Amino acid sequence: MEEDFEFGFSEDPRFSVERYEEMIRNQDQYFFDAQAFENIIEYYIEKNDPIKALQVTDYAINQHPFAAVFSIKQAQLYVATNQFDLAFESLCRAETLEPSEADIYTIRGNVYEGMERHQDALDNYEKALTLAESTDEILLHIAYVYQSMGDYENSVNYLKQCLQQNMENQDALYELAFCYDVLDKQEESIKFYEQYIDNEPYSYAAWYNLGNAFNKMDLFEKSIDAYDYAILIKDNFASAYFNKGNALVHLDRYAEAIEVYKQTFEYEPPSGDTYCAIGECYEKLERMDEARSYYKKSVKLDPAQSDAWFGIGVTLDFEERYFESLYFYRKALDLDDKNADYWFAIADAQYKLKQLPESEKAYEKVLELNPVDIEAWLDYSSILFEQDKLDSAIEVISEGIKNNPDSAELYYRMVAYLFAAQQFSEALIYLETALNSDPEKHHILFEYLPQLHENKVIVDIINRYTR
């Protein structure tokens, strides 16, 4: 025991803690040197007991009133326990004792940052910059403040300075990617990370963020290459596998994506998001039983995963089990009632079940949420047309054109409805507009009303634009 604890050497942290706790039990007063007090404070911090650590700082300040370090420690502990006024008092005392100590201004800046007193935070961080030997974390906090102020350009500047001081600061690398994303400056992001990689080729975080930037620019092959480098450097990098899977999905490489998504399970527990992503891949491959199995795994892990509930509905819809699919579409809608895709699926399923009034209401909701959904305008008007509500169908398409004046599909559909309504002159005006917009799509007019093939006037006009 004596060999383990080296009794008699007060600098041994365990010995100091034992003496301190003995003093408390005996309600006595023992003397400890400054280093011993620091060791005792750190012991309680590591034990996640800030209250006892604070008690030690009181004894330390009492025995070593001119040691600023204990007032600084005390301030940190007051911040950790949300006692901000007391933290400010401790910092003022420390500043009186040691005004050139950078930690005083860094901690005060942290408190002001949490209080959203942005300028006060910046003033203290700037003061700390002039005093600190290592500045990358201070520069990072200044960047955070500018983000809170919505000034992402300035945040980028400070994040770059942070990385100049410490190229391995992972937080700065990720925050910089976030800022470039908010600013929609993906090309600048790519340029930065490529230059960074030239100097730090083994930075998995840089390769990962480069992959994300390529992804956002729809450069999916390049993003996959970047994720592969990130994985090569850090083979347990689950997020890189997941995002690589997403890129493969964008390239319609669903079977590969499934395998990559499943690789994440080797390095982190399965999540509802990953199960849902795998389910979507199986759905795209029309392997509906497997898709449904993974969607069910997703909602079991995360009942709030609305896309997975929706996915179950899609698999049932595919199997023409429309009534069952409606139940799951509504489960998704309960979680996200502003999702136009969910409303569209409900409208379509209700149409297939001949629930036409309900389908019409659902389509109205789709168009309220997403007035640029061309297919929804076409389908809604088609339901009305099938019920001989020709005027209403024309009215719906007219509203669709107002919201989507460049959509040739809507103009061609209007031609069909106007001919059906025997409004021939107006129909020909819309036909000219449709052909001017996109003559190659004229076939959709005949697909909807095949009998128009026999109309020589229409055929002649179309031939003028397509020959």
Each model region followed by its residue ranges:
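Canonical tetratricopeptide repeat
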Residues: K73, I107, H141, E175, ...
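Structural marker of alpha-solenoid helical repeat scaffolds
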Residues: Q63, T96-E98, L131-A132, Q165, ...
